[in-house]
Amino acid sequence: MKSNPAIQAAIDLTAGAAGGTACVLTGQPFDTMKVKMQTFPDLYRGLTDCCLKTYSQVGFRGFYKGTSPALIANIAENSVLFMCYGFCQQVVRKVAGLDKQAKLSDLQNAAAGSFASAFAALVLCPTELVKCRLQTMYEMETSGKIAKSQNTVWSVIKSILRKDGPLGFYHGLSSTLLREVPGYFFFFGGYELSRSFFASGRSKDELGPVPLMLSGGVGGICLWLAVYPVDCIKSRIQVLSMSGKQAGFIRTFINVVKNEGITALYSGLKPTMIRAFPANGALFLAYEYSRKLMMNQLEAY
């Protein structure tokens, strides 16, 4: 059966959702540590200290704070990302004057991923805002920046709507876009280059699960090394805006560098790097295999 664009988009969207779920389930505790260390670098001496304090203060559940919005965020982001990735690949083919079925180069795939990430950022920003606030609620309360309240997804959503209205969910959108667009160029670029390396002249579609996971891990490492300081500023804007009006990206960036130094922009890098390999490896493994399964069923139908 010949695939039409709507069916292809639905397959990419579903496979992206599977990838997003796998990413969260494998990497959530490290993401929680990352956000805590980015937003409150003075409270933690390092990853081990952050883990021990989180466990002593909140218990094991503290590592999984924000898992529900993280799942929603990653499913929404990766569904839109991979659906738009397929569409953007066609745009790149058209701009480059290629046939609709032509294989793109690794650089062209990276460009398509970068374009697709701009659309994904629009659905990611609101859910990531809720996730980041839930993950740092304990620190915000104990530092006196906000009053004690219920630490639930719904309480955070109601607080945002009450204070800022629907547009409040887009605190940090500019920094999210600044992270996503260049970041996903390196993400897809690193992934595709790694797949080309492991394929060694064979078709990339023939790669097994281990090369796929390693390629996904390389893509994740490339993304975070390229844009980590931007992500740090994004986390601060989204979390600290809980206590009142927060400065924009440029002013927040200048304040952090001036008052805390350049190294503050890399707070939480270690858990991010540890998380990048398994989480992004699982993402691409789930995406590629679920997509292949659905494509095979479609062709057999």
From Swiss-Prot:
Keywords from the UniProt entry: Disease variant, Membrane, Mitochondrion, Mitochondrion inner membrane, Repeat, Transmembrane, Transmembrane helix, Transport
Tissue-wise expression: Highly expressed in liver, pancreas, testis, lung and small intestine. Lower levels are detected in spleen, kidney, brain and heart.
Documented activity regulation: Inhibited by pyridoxal 5'-phosphate as well as by mercurials (mersalyl, p-chloromercuribenzene sulfonate, and mercuric chloride), N-ethylmaleimide and spermine.
Result for mutant: R179Q: Substrate specificities are markedly altered. Vmax value is 14-fold lower for ornithine as substrate
InterPro entries: Mitochondrial_Carrier, Mitochondrial_sb/sol_carrier, Mt_carrier_dom_sf
Effect of mutating M273K: In HHHS; exhibits very low transport activity despite normal insertion in the liposomal membrane
Catalyzed reaction equations: L-citrulline(in) + L-ornithine(out) + H(+)(in) = L-citrulline(out) + L-ornithine(in) + H(+)(out); L-ornithine(in) + L-arginine(out) = L-ornithine(out) + L-arginine(in); L-ornithine(out) + L-lysine(in) = L-ornithine(in) + L-lysine(out); L-lysine(out) + H(+)(in) = L-lysine(in) + H(+)(out)
Cell compartment(s), UniProt: Mitochondrion inner membrane; Mitochondrion membrane
Membrane topology (UniProt): Multi-pass membrane protein
GO molecular function: antiporter activity; L-arginine transmembrane transporter activity; L-lysine transmembrane transporter activity; L-ornithine transmembrane transporter activity
Effect caused by changing T272I: In HHHS; exhibits very low transport activity despite normal insertion in the liposomal membrane
Outcome after substituting N74A: Does not affect ornithine-ornithine exchange. Does not affect substrate specificity
Result when mutating G113C: In HHHS; exhibits very low transport activity despite normal insertion in the liposomal membrane
An annotated GO BP: mitochondrial L-ornithine transmembrane transport
Annotated disease: Hyperornithinemia-hyperammonemia-homocitrullinuria syndrome: An autosomal recessive disorder of the urea cycle characterized by onset in early life. The acute phase of the disease is characterized by vomiting, ataxia, lethargy, confusion, and coma. Chronic clinical manifestations include hypotonia, developmental delay, progressive encephalopathy with mental regression, and spastic paraparesis with pyramidal signs.
Similarity-based family: Belongs to the mitochondrial carrier (TC 2.A.29) family.
Protein name: Mitochondrial ornithine transporter 1
Protein species of origin: Homo sapiens
Lineage per the UniProt record: Eukaryota, Metazoa, Chordata, Craniata, Vertebrata
